[in-house]
A protein has these predicted regions:
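C-terminal motif of bacterial Sec signal peptides marking the signal peptidase cleavage site
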Residues: 19-21
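Bacterial lipoprotein signal-peptidase II cleavage site
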Residues: 23-29
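Extracytoplasmic
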Residues: 44, 49-230
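N-terminal module-boundary/linker segments of secreted carbohydrate-active enzymes
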Residues: 54-60, 205-278, 283-290, 493, ...
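Aromatic-lined carbohydrate-recognition surfaces of secreted/lumenal glycan-active proteins
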Residues: 248-250, 392-394, 398, 415-440, ...
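Aromatic- and acid-rich polysaccharide-binding/catalytic face
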Residues: 275, 439-462, 508-509
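Substrate-binding cleft of extracellular glycoside hydrolase catalytic domains
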Residues: 283-413, 417, 428
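Substrate-binding cleft of secreted/luminal carbohydrate-active enzymes
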Residues: 479-548
Length: 548
């Protein structure tokens, strides 16, 4: 059933497998094209796996009550006052406060010890300048550990984002989202992760984490044709937004390996099964061996029948030249493929072929539309089964990693081409469009997006509040926000404490959870933490969904 939308937005009237034996996982069907070693069993948590899931899940862990005592506070610490004797103090590059400032070279760090009066949230402002380097802020670090990429040593503790310091000879304030800190002495560490940075000072002030942003979001649906299941799903998502977080897990393509591991260890399934349509195009299919049939849509159908929600990303292999996702390896020029001529968006492949033959469009444009049709044909299977799909195509990175990120206008036009073609030619009115952008200039616009996504790869257990606030700002809080990709789901207690209730948290597949034998590694998340996540009152598992 479809509901025609007569105005620009629709306002919602009301506030969605393997067996237990482990089989060998084929990592040639992974969305990561690079060769990565599998994690070894170095964490005893990997041995905690239960052979038989609990028979009944009847109790839920109550959220931990973090003490918050609001109190006015402000303190500025000059960088030159806290460094070791003998550290060079600079005075000649930019106007500064205090007696001077310090320079942090590549991967160097400096610690600020701050005595705080109460347990509460605090804003931290970094006064910095430099030549385009980047600095991270960590709290509570006690020892040095390997960074995620293995290139340097960083402090453990809670990471609160990386901040690009613009090239300038003037100190600029960089504001960190509210951070929960306890009464007493707190260690705040700044460390460069690229280039060099000059640090003048940090300022710590009290903060009050507000929740009104949840109420503003999620009252409109993109597009003109709205499937009833899509409307129902959006209404449900709006009803839980800011109150609970949906569990979500990516799977190795054409398997349910990761979600089976979760069930074995928690007795529950994630609310959302997250797949990837990367192998549905001609170029993507060429990477599959004969033994690896592309059967993921059938698994998604079965998942939906069992009461789960379905999500699909699309990491798009280049349709011409060398098959790759990455701009640095790609011969395909997407700027030649996009067109502003909307009449082409809804033409069939046969009609487009005629235009290609007479020179009205080029091969790049034709191939783009063909790939869209290949993916649409798979999504149509789910449409025919009345299954709503959370659809997240064309992820955006900070460093323009993928070929579709060439420039903002090309990206936005490509998004528009896809959405209009899917909706009008293929009648895919069951898609909930998720735009995974972190840059405002890449955002296609509210008329083309239902939910905004944020991909954050951070190996410390914090809520990533800075990422949520930055993402919210792209749409002025008009769209619900999901943590669409992460190494693992953050602790629900910390999500609650930070008032950072992502709509869902999409934990990555493969080495981030299991090894090649299909067993949990414990390298990123322990069994005990996973049990907490899936049995917590602030999270929703598959058996707790109530969309109907």
């Amino acid at each position: 059933m479809k509901i025609k939308k007569f105005i620009g937005t629709v306002f919602l009237a009301t506030a969605i497998v393997f067996t237990c034996a482990c089989s060998k996982i084929d990592y040639t069907a992974s969305t990561d094209n690079e060769s990565l070693p599998l994690p070894s069993f170095t964490d005893d948590n990997s041995r905690e796996e239960s052979n038989v899931p609990p028979a009944n899940i009847t109790t839920e862990l109550m959220k931990e009550n973090y003490k918050i005592e609001l109190k006015d506070y402000k303190l500025t610490k000059e960088a030159e006052e806290i460094v070791k004797e003998g550290t060079e103090i600079f005075t000649d590059v930019a106007p500064f406060t205090g007696e001077g400032y310090i320079r942090l070279g590549a991967f160097q760090s400096v610690d600020f010890l701050i005595e705080l009066p109460t347990d509460q949230h605090y804003n931290i402002t970094i006064s910095a300048c430099g030549n385009g380097g980047a600095v991270t802020l960590t709290t509570g670090g006690t020892k040095l550990i390997d960074s995620e990429n293995g290139k340097y040593k960083r402090w453990n503790g809670n990471q609160h984002g990386a901040y690009k310091v613009h090239q300038s000879r003037l100190f600029t304030d960089y504001n960190v989202a509210p951070v929960y800190l306890e009464k007493g002495i707190n260690k705040i560490t700044l460390q460069t992760v690229s280039g060099s940075v000059y640090i003048d000072s940090i300022t710590v002030t009290e903060a009050n984490v507000k929740s009104d942003r949840y109420e503003k979001a999620g009252t409109s649906i993109a597009g003109d044709e709205i499937n009833y299941g899509r409307l129902q799903t959006m209404s449900y998502l709006k009803s839980i937004y800011g109150k609970q977080t949906l569990t979500a897990q990516y799977v190795t393509p054409n398997t349910n390996a990761e979600i089976d591991v979760i069930y074995r260890n928690t007795g529950r399934y994630p609310a959302i099964r997250c797949g990837d349509l990367t192998y549905c195009t001609k170029a993507g299919a060429s990477l599959l061996s004969g033994a690896n049939e592309n059967t993921d849509i059938e698994l998604a159908k079965e998942w939906a029948k069992q009461g789960g929600m379905v999500m699909y990303s699309w990491y798009w292999y280049s349709p011409i030249g060398k098959t790759s996702l990455y701009a640095k390896d790609c011969e395909f020029d997407v700027t030649k493929a996009v067109t502003d001529n909307e009449k082409y968006y809804t033409l069939t492949e046969e009609e487009l072929k005629l235009l290609l033959d007479d020179g009205s469009i080029n091969e790049e444009c034709f191939k783009i539309f063909c790939d869209m049709d290949s993916v649409a044909s798979q999504l149509k299977i789910l449409y025919n089964e009345d299954i709503p799909v959370l659809f997240k195509p064309m992820a955006v990175t900070d460093n323009e990693t993928y070929w579709w990120e060439t420039d903002e206008e090309t990206y936005k036009t490509l998004w528009k081409m896809m959405q209009i073609r899917f909706e009008e030619l293929h009648e895919l009115s069951n898609l909930i469009w998720i735009c995974p952008v972190t840059k405002g200039r890449m955002y296609p616009g509210d008329d083309y997006v239902d939910i905004i996504g944020c991909d954050i790869f951070n190996n410390s257990d914090n809520a990533n509040l800075q990422g949520m606030l930055n993402t919210d700002a792209l749409t002025l809080n008009t769209k619900m926000t999901a943590l669409t990709e992460c190494f693992f789901t953050p602790d629900p207690d910390i999500l609650y404490r930070e008032n950072c209730m992502w709509l869902w948290c999409g934990a990555l597949d493969g080495k981030y959870l299991i090894n090649s034998e299909g067993y949990m590694t414990g390298n990123y998340i322990s069994v005990s933490q996973m049990k907490k996540i899936y049995n917590h009152e602030l999270t929703i598992a598959r058996d707790e969904l109530s969309i109907d």
